Amino acid sequence: MTKHSGIDPLTQISPNQHVLIRLPSDNLKIVELKANAIVSLGKFGAFRVNEIIGYRFGTTFDIVYDGVEEEFVKGTQTMIGKISVLENRLKASSPALENSSENNRGLINLGSVVQEMSMAEIEAMKREAASGDAIISKMIESHKSFHQKTVHSQEKYLKRKKQKFAKFFTVEYLDSSGLLHYLIEKGDVLRVMDISQESLGMALNLANINSNGQYLCIDETGGLIVYAMLERMFAGDSNSKANGKIVVVHENEHPNLDLLKFSSYSDNFIQRHVKTISVLDFFEPAKEADIKSLFKPLSAEEINDLKSNKKSAYFRRLKWYHNQLSNIEVAASSFDGLLVASTLYLPTLIPRLGEKIHGSRPIVCYSQYKEPLLELSHSLYENLNYLAPSLLETRCRPYQTVRGKLHPLMTMKGGGGYLMWCHRVLPAAEPKLHQETLEKSEIKNSDEEGDEDAHKLDQEKQVIKRRKPNEDNEKL
């Protein structure tokens, strides 16, 4: 991500980046803001990207159609409107509440009876591109028993109508927490292994992720773990001078890091700081001599003499050659931490990966089930190379407040997964004694044994002396 005409892409909306748009219904949508493009939000309207460039993230915009020429999104009936900035999302399209009742006793719970405005009239206003505020105000005027509702009931009614007819939206920065929230709301819980925002943040903290660290990772969440690690290491800045690196070990032919397409990092930046390697190449890398015997790089003159088809084949082989040498280098490296989110059998995998971790460095494993981590912790208890394996579970219960009431949110998502955390240690070897020390120790032990034998002999003589007078008395 680079600055565009003085715009800071970390705090301000800039072109050619992915953002999170929060709709009036509180649903989320990921949109790529291409310069001079038009973004359609379906029934909520459409707008031009250039009109929101430069505003700060978190700004709420309203789509208005007053004095706008009719122009529709190509292939749809969605009309393109102008953008106006709202001070507060909560105040958007909120007609003033004047009259209310102390209770709902006189209400008639039949919408067709109390609502004089028909659906045909509402659809006609929508086709005329009327604002959400105008539609909601008209519905309130046509509602016979609206003023017989309590204030709380009126607020709930307005909230429902705003979610349906309002045309405002909020642009938010697409960070790892927002991306995870979007995936969960979308229903991709299995894709991210049921991880919660709290578990994700706890894993990054326990793994001690920092900008200049070298980390080993197994990510089966589609790239969410790597996305969060990059955010923690470089804070979304493609111009960062930090030299941190992430090595991603994968079991398939190609790694699944699909979610990195939503990041604002350039391809060169990701290639420089994220290295992928298969499990086989990591544990059993090829020998450097064998690689060099299979391929020999050519000089610049020899490359120029090649034909076009042979030249392309040569560059493919050259890429393979450098990749194999890089795999050998990675397999021989040591790392500052290990972060695993995988369905592989951890009790045999973690000890193998742990050999590549520096001493006094953390190891963090995530699983949506407790049993695999429990079995892993039991196996690590018996291994002196790992210190204090601990199981953690995070729970965050949001509360909602109503007038005079406070209770937990009844529709919250369960689960969130479990974490196993320990430290890689290097046990000190037993000290070797000097030869003279060993000889003195042996002499001392032999002297002590001799003293013990002499003491036992004296005790036996005393026993014999006590027995002899007794025997003489018996004879007499």
UniProtKB/Swiss-Prot annotation:
GO biological processes = tRNA methylation
Q: Is Nucleus included in the keywords of this UniProt record?
A: yes
Q: Where is this region: Disordered?
A: 433-476
Q: Where does the record place it?
A: Nucleus
A GO cellular component annotation in the UniProt record? tRNA (m1A) methyltransferase complex
Say if the entry is tagged with keyword RNA-binding. Answer: yes
Q: Which GO MF terms are attached to this record? A: RNA binding
Q: Which is an annotated Pfam family here?
A: Gcd10p
InterPro entries named in the record: TRM6 (IPR017423)
Q: Which keywords appear in this protein's UniProt record, sorted alphabetically?
A: Nucleus, RNA-binding, tRNA processing
The record describes the protein's role as: Substrate-binding subunit of tRNA (adenine-N(1)-)-methyltransferase, which catalyzes the formation of N(1)-methyladenine at position 58 (m1A58) in initiator methionyl-tRNA.
Please give the family membership noted in the entry: Belongs to the TRM6/GCD10 family.
Query: Subunit details for this protein?
Result: Heterotetramer; composed of two copies of TRM6 and two copies of TRM61.
* Entry protein name: tRNA (adenine(58)-N(1))-methyltransferase non-catalytic subunit TRM6
Which species does the entry assign this protein to?
Answer: Kluyveromyces lactis (strain ATCC 8585 / CBS 2359 / DSM 70799 / NBRC 1267 / NRRL Y-1140 / WM37)
